[in-house]
Each structure stands twice: as C-alpha cells, then as structure tokens.
C-alpha cells in the first residue's frame, strides 16, 4: 500500500531494556543493522501493525508502549535500492514506537516463519544514529530525539546526524 505521495506506511520499533539500551538487529544475509520495522496493512492501525511486526520479526510482543511519535517521519529510498520497479514509490513514512521489553532475553527469537534478522544485541540509546544506513539517518535521529524525554535520556553528543564528522562509534553488548 503506497499513499498518493509515493510513501509506504510503516511502523518502527525502538525496544528498550531496563538499562534503556535499545535492541539493534542485523538484517539476514547483509552487513546491515537496524531497528525492527514493517508495513501497515490495509485497515490496520499503527499499533496493530507494531504488535504484528514484533511477532514476525523478533518472535515476541512482550512489550509495554512507552510512547510514539506525534506524526509521520519520512525517508526516501534511493532508486538503486528499490526491490521492484514501482513508478510511484519514493520511500517510507513511519510512526515510531518506544517500547519497554518485558520478557526474558531467551524469548527474543529471530527464527520466525520468514526471518528478517540473524542476530541482535543491546546497544546504547544513541548509537543507531551513527550506524544506520545514511538515507535512514535523519528519521532515526528524529524518532530517538522525540522519544528520548519519555525515558529521561540526555540529549545526544552531536548536533547534526547527517554530518560525517559528528559520527562516532559506540560499542554495544548483549
């Protein structure tokens, strides 16, 4: 489902543990890490899509909703990365959810019916902005920045996430 402007409605999920680290997942068969995300089906609310996508991508929906972004955040997908030829397709528009994981780590199961991820780890809250593919960077920055006050996170140590001199690696752990 693509809207009139060429954007596919989607949900993004920032899953926090008790230390406010976030779940960072490695895409299957790629050297790319990201937050879980997925499309919103016809007649589905963003919240319904979020719970369905959690089950499909990380094998559990044992989360509590802390908050969500006020509106849609958009990014354009470079033409070279389009999976199929879609004349109207420009990118994704996303509602982001900040979630508290309430299960045991053993309940995170990436071996789902159609696996999208092959590994995961807990990382510092702001680290994904530095590590995500460049065309998603601003949306990650906006989502993390808008939702950070809900868990009393300090502002990030940089001002513009799209300037390479402001990027710095941060090590994560499981």
Swiss-Prot record:
Required co-factors: a divalent metal cation
Superkingdom of source: Bacteria
Annotated signal peptide: none
Pfam families for this protein: NUDIX
Biological process, per Gene Ontology: mRNA catabolic process
NCBIfam families: PRK00714.1-3, PRK00714.1-4, PRK00714.1-5
Listed PANTHER family: M7GPPPN-MRNA HYDROLASE
Name this polypeptide is given: RNA pyrophosphohydrolase
Species, as recorded: Acidithiobacillus ferrooxidans (strain ATCC 53993 / BNL-5-31)
Gene behind the chain: rppH
């Amino acid at each position: 489902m693509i809207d009139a402007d060429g954007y596919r409605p989607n949900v993004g999920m920032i899953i926090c543990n008790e230390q406010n680290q976030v779940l960072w997942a490695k895409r299957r068969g790629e050297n790319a890490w990201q937050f879980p995300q997925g499309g919103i089906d016809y007649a589905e609310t963003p919240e319904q899509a979020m719970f369905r996508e959690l089950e499909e991508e990380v094998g559990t929906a044992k989360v509590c909703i802390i908050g969500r972004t006020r509106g849609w955040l958009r990014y354009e997908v470079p033409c070279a990365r389009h999976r199929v030829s879609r004349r109207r397709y420009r990118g994704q528009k996303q509602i982001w959810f900040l979630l508290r994981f309430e299960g045991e780590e053993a309940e995170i199961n990436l071996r789902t019916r159609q696996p999208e991820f092959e590994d995961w780890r807990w990382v510092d809250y702001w680290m994904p902005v530095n590590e995500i593919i460049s065309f998603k960077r601003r949306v990650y920055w906006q989502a993390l920045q808008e939702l950070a006050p809900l868990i009393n996170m300090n502002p990030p140590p940089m001002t513009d996430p799209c300037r390479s001199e402001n990027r710095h690696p941060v090590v994560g752990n499981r």
